[in-house]
Swiss-Prot record:
Protein name per its UniProtKB record: Imidazole glycerol phosphate synthase subunit HisF
E.C. no: 4.3.2.10
Pathway involvement of the protein, from the record: Amino-acid biosynthesis; L-histidine biosynthesis; L-histidine from 5-phospho-alpha-D-ribose 1-diphosphate: step 5/9
Catalytic residue list: D11, D130
Origin species: Mesorhizobium japonicum (strain LMG 29417 / CECT 9101 / MAFF 303099) (Mesorhizobium loti (strain MAFF 303099))
Classification lineage: Bacteria, Pseudomonadati, Pseudomonadota, Alphaproteobacteria, Hyphomicrobiales
Amino acid sequence: MLKARVIPCLDVKDGRVVKGVNFVDLIDAGDPVEAAKAYDAAGADELCFLDITASSDNRETIFDVIARTAEQCFMPLTVGGGVRQVADIRKLLLAGADKVSINTAAVKNPDFVAEAADKFGNQCIVVAIDAKKVSGAGEADRWEIFTHGGREKTGIDAVEFARKMVDRGAGEILLTSMDRDGTKAGYDIALTRAIADAVRAPIIASGGVGTLDHLVEGIRDGHAGAVLAASIFHFGTYTIAQAKAHMAAAGLPMRLDSSGDRP
């Protein structure tokens, strides 16, 4: 069985972390490179940067952030936000990203995913899916894709879309439950499992983590290959080491061998 991965996520806007990271010894909690270095030292398996810069004029800042992070960190780096064309992916990979996450552009043009996977390899193409439950009480579970930060309904079935994306070459699915995001009530396990069981690519579960048990549930019950969380790590509620130790104690296979993440 593949080892489960723990992935912190940083929202970056105009080169700054939007939700500050509460590491005591950080010189500048708003500097994504400082935050990334802290997570690298703490034993995170990967790191996700989400560039939420509104203006395309400021896109160059994320390339600088990635380049500086890649120089100083050894964990794989996934970058998403504003990826619309092959040239964007090329620039991100050249800057030092290991994987690139495609969201709205994949919904608008599924063939873009196939083109990207063909050019760069499916191992570095992640498709980010934001899904909301649309089925009512007593109906079979059904989720739809939403875009533009969960504001725009597409009418596209989330499970079918995930299948299509993996068929087109996505090497991984970053799955966020819009219903659970920010609630600290745990992942939408039914959604996560439905998509994990429908595709042959790993699922990164996202949205709703409030406790360490939620991380265990994402892997054990949701069949995800990785768990993503933000606030529980950023604000010091739990450390990466505590998360991994808790997951290992629950019987999940974890990477616990680096100096930064020994329980």
